[in-house]
């Protein structure tokens, strides 16, 4: 089943895959990493100027990593927002996705957290470094194949 945004993207020749609707009726689309930045700019111009949230998850041990964007478009008033969920999948061996910081500034800390927890590299992010874990931390704690260390010592800065 194709939603309104999916039909609009097809009409304008933009490559994507419709993943249907979630339990709240929000349209979900899959965009390839190489197409994501240009599609993000087009969505912003089309009216999706609010990035409500960005998160990431590990699809399966040894499988793909996903970066998820929840966008909102308010065209007919705040009581009738149009929402869409965009999923961008990247291979675990080279998890690179273009950063949308330059489109939606609110992606800054959210993309940094996804990098810190899952190791997804967001190309052209202005300050992609760890935000929750110490810089010396080894590995990506939310990956399903992550092996937690038995002991980790945090040295006091004093």
From Swiss-Prot:
Would you name any one GO CC term?
A: chloroplast thylakoid membrane
The record's subcellular locations are: Plastid, Chloroplast thylakoid membrane
Question: Does NADP count among this protein's keywords?
Answer: yes
Which membrane topology term applies here?
Peripheral membrane protein
Q: Which leading EC class covers this enzyme?
A: translocase
Q: Keyword set for this entry?
A: Chloroplast, Membrane, NAD, NADP, Plastid, Plastoquinone, Quinone, Thylakoid, Translocase, Transport
Q: Which organism is it from?
A: Citrus sinensis (Sweet orange)
Q: Which InterPro entries match?
A: NADH_DH_suC, NADH_quin_OxRdtase_su_C/D-like, NADH_UbQ_OxRdtase_30kDa_su, NADH_UbQ_OxRdtase_CS
Descriptive protein name: NAD(P)H-quinone oxidoreductase subunit J, chloroplastic
Q: What does this protein do?
A: NDH shuttles electrons from NAD(P)H:plastoquinone, via FMN and iron-sulfur (Fe-S) centers, to quinones in the photosynthetic chain and possibly in a chloroplast respiratory chain. The immediate electron acceptor for the enzyme in this species is believed to be plastoquinone. Couples the redox reaction to proton translocation, and thus conserves the redox energy in a proton gradient.
Gene name, Swiss-Prot/TrEMBL: ndhJ
Write down the chemical reaction(s) this protein catalyses: a plastoquinone + NADH + (n+1) H(+)(in) = a plastoquinol + NAD(+) + n H(+)(out); a plastoquinone + NADPH + (n+1) H(+)(in) = a plastoquinol + NADP(+) + n H(+)(out)
According to its UniProt record, the EC number is 7.1.1.-
GO MF assignments? NADH dehydrogenase (ubiquinone) activity; quinone binding
PROSITE patterns in alphabetical order: COMPLEX1_30K
Q: What does the subunit section of this Swiss-Prot or TrEMBL entry state?
A: NDH is composed of at least 16 different subunits, 5 of which are encoded in the nucleus.
């Amino acid at each position: 089943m194709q939603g309104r945004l999916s039909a609009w993207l097809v009409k304008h020749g933009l490559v994507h895959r419709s993943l249907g609707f979630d339990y709240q009726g929000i349209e979900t689309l899959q965009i390839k990493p190489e197409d994501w930045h240009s599609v993000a700019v087009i969505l912003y111009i089309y009216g999706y100027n609010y990035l409500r949230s960005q998160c990431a998850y590990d699809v399966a041990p040894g499988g793909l990593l996903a970066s998820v964007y929840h966008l909102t478009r308010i065209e007919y008033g705040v009581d009738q927002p149009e929402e869409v969920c965009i999923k961008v999948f990247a291979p675990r061996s080279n998890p690179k996705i273009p950063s949308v910081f330059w489109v939606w500034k609110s992606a800054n800390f959210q993309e940094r957290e996804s990098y810190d927890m899952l190791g997804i590299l967001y190309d052209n992010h202005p300050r992609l470094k760890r935000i929750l874990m110490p810089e010396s931390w080894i590995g990506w704690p939310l990956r399903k194949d992550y092996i937690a260390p038995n002991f980790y010592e945090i040295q006091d800065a004093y």
